[in-house]
């Protein structure tokens, strides 16, 4: 077995000294201790930075007056380039908003030309235009689904659902319909309307042969007018019916009208000849308009007028009755 004695210094020196000289051992030991020294220096630097930050925070914690300051991110300094960038971004945002509003207004103007509401003096608001367009689209879809043409009153009621009164008047005027013929507040959710006037159940209709009902889009909604016989008191004095009166002809002669001679007296008085004492003139005298002068002069005492003839110089017998009643 080949072994080398440890006491031989020559062999050890030649074998070890060829690769690693003895002078390098001290250098290696010195190099191994350098990283620890660097860590110590870094720790000292970080401690110094922390102390500076603490001092800054202490300084920022109070202002000149000793009041606490706001903590948070510090505001960046406004340089000229940054001011220009902010101004450009703001101008671009304003231009986008302006273009958006112009496009919206143009679309609403186009929509106002389509909906059935036109006025030269009044312009619909944005919300009223959108509501009317929604009702119009819904009404057209109902027409397409049912395949029947609706009544004009029903169509207008559908269009005016949820609209204000001025817009309702405009729509009714555009469709040539009176806005009083329907009540938009009583419209239900579905378009099931009878097409009749809501006032028809309150007022009973009066059918007269002398009155002609006007023809219109909704005949049922128009309330016929009633003829009043204003000339019925004069018809008993003539053989034929007066053409100015709208009342029907009478089947037989009527009794003379009742005379109102006083407040509390309601009785029929016999005709009195007033022609003898008429030098003061007459008042409240109702002369038949169609009678000629000769007929009125010849039959003045025989005819009985619907109103009393009061003479200025005449004493009434009813006055005595009134005085007796009050005394």
From Swiss-Prot:
Biased composition (Basic and acidic residues): 24-46
Entry GO MF terms: DNA-binding transcription factor activity, RNA polymerase II-specific; E-box binding; protein dimerization activity
Ranges annotated as biased composition (Acidic residues): 47-63
Tissues where this protein is expressed: Embryonic olfactory bulbs. In adult, expressed in brain, eye, intestine, muscle, ovary and skin.
Top-level division of the source organism's lineage: Eukaryota
Protein's cellular compartments: Nucleus
SMART domains: HLH (SM00353)
Region (Disordered): 17-85
Pfam families: HLH, Neuro_bHLH
Function summary: Differentiation factor required for neurogenesis. Acts as an upstream activator of isl1.
Identification of the protein by name: Neurogenic differentiation factor 6-A
Protein's organism: Danio rerio
Principal localisation: nucleus
Quaternary structure annotation from Swiss-Prot or TrEMBL: Efficient DNA binding requires dimerization with another bHLH protein.
Ranges spanned by the short sequence motif Nuclear localization signal, renumbered to the chain: 74-80
């Amino acid at each position: 077995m080949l072994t080398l004695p440890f006491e031989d210094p020559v062999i050890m020196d030649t074998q070890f000294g060829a690769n690693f000289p003895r002078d390098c051992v001290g250098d290696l030991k010195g190099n191994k201790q350098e990283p620890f020294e660097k860590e110590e220096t870094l720790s000292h630097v970080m401690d110094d930075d922390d102390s500076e930050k603490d001092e800054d925070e202490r300084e920022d914690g109070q202002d000149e007056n000793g009041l606490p300051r706001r903590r948070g991110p510090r505001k960046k300094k406004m340089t000229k380039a940054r001011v220009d960038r902010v101004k450009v971004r703001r101008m671009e945002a304003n231009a986008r908003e302006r273009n958006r509003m112009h496009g919206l207004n143009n679309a609403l103007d186009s929509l106002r030309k389509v909906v059935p509401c036109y006025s030269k003096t009044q312009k619909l608001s944005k919300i009223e235009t959108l509501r009317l367009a929604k009702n119009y689209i819904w009404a057209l879809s109902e027409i397409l689904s049912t395949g029947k043409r609706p009544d004009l009153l029903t169509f207008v009621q559908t269009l005016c659902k949820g609209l204000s009164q001025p817009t309702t008047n405009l729509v009714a005027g555009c469709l040539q319909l009176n806005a009083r013929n329907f009540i938009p507040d009583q419209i239900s959710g579905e378009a099931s309307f009878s097409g009749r006037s809501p006032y028809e159940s309150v007022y009973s209709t009066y059918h007269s042969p002398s009155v002609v009902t006007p023809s219109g889009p909704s005949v049922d909604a128009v309330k016929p007018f009633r003829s009043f016989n204003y000339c019925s008191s004069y018809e008993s004095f003539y053989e034929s019916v007066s053409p100015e009166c709208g009342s029907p002809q009478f089947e037989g002669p009527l009794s003379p009208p009742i005379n109102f001679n006083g407040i509390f007296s309601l009785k029929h008085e016999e005709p009195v000849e007033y022609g003898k004492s008429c030098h003061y003139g007459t008042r409240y005298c109702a002369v038949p308009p169609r009678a000629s002068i000769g007929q009125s002069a010849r039959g003045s005492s025989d005819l009985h007028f619907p109103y009393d003839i009061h003479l200025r110089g005449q004493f009434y017998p009813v006055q005595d009755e009134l005085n007796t009643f009050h005394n």
